[in-house]
Amino acid sequence: MEGKIGSIVAIEPSTGEVLCMVSSPSYDPRSMVGRQRSKNHRILTASPLKPLLNRSIMGQYPPGSTFKTTQGLTFASEGIISPDHTAFPCSHGFNFKGLHVGCHGHASPLSLVPALSTSCNAYFCWGLYYMMGAKSKYGSVQNAMNRWRDYMVSMGFGYRLGIDLPGEKRGLIPNADFYDNAYRGSWNGLTIISISIGQGEVNATPLQIANLGATIANRGYFYVPHVVRKVQDEPLDTLYRRRHYTMAKRQAYDYVVAGMRSSAVGGTCRELSRYDINACGKTGTAQNRGHDHSVFMGFAPMDNPKIAVAVYVENGGWGATYGVPIGGLIMEQYIHGRLSEASMKRAEEFQHRHIAYGNIGR
């Protein structure tokens, strides 16, 4: 993460143990002791780079297209889509009643697995539109919205996960009251369509996105992420040993895993195919006021996974530009205990690839 602002979080899916937590830029902790500690603290506090902010648990970002995995799980589990048979059109985006949400060029129409592989925006926009409009199933858009939110909360979003570190933020998952207040009760699926692709009012921490990767790796459950592996002569607190199951069905997870694997083989995460780790992944390009953030969420190997990773590089552009390569290198290092010669060169390349942050500087 040299010359970059962002975060990397890695979790062991089978235990919830945090394997890696990087927040960039960092600072030398030795500067916080001795006679100059007060002066140094003031300097760090005043820095526009915010080095004292642990972005892994305090940074709240749009999840971008990594969030499409949660949408596929929800729509499939609720019967809004049939993963094998429901196919939605995409003509360079979602186009309906004057609303346009852009997308890149790819085959159309698509079912769930190729929609995840290609990161199709239109597919998930259609899914949310039909869920919010299913009055015969939910009775009202408000009930549909709260049902959607319940799924997101069950997957670890909208509240603190409970990691054993101070300062964790909760992110944001809106409910029906949120939109009733914002739009005075006059809203529908089209009004909030951007949440289906991880934009709009949705925010998450890198820890929550890494936990999503661990949950998908486990096909439907997670452990509360924790830094402490064990305490001598004491059992680990039951809080960190209890499985938390989501509302999504196991079969829905199988389809999402297939989509993430397809993405790693020939989709938006195809960079992962250069690493011998049988990975599954999902890119994200999180829009914000400046340049887009480069986001990645994935795990490896596909079966009996050992590691789940989330990467956020602020203003890094496409998810495949920084997020996927960095995530792939971390997974390869952890699984094999080393990097191949080609990966070593790749790591050095990205170490020295700095991002210009305008007036902020480095």
Residue ranges and their predicted role:
Residues 1-4:
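Serine endopeptidase catalytic core focused on the charge-relay Asp
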Residues 6, 11-66, 70-319, 354-362:
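Beta-lactam-recognizing serine transpeptidase/beta-lactamase-like catalytic domain environment
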Residues 237-244, 326-362:
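Short, gly/Ser/Thr-rich active-site loops of penicillin-recognizing serine hydrolases
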Residues 321-325:
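Generic recognition of short, well-ordered alpha-helical segments
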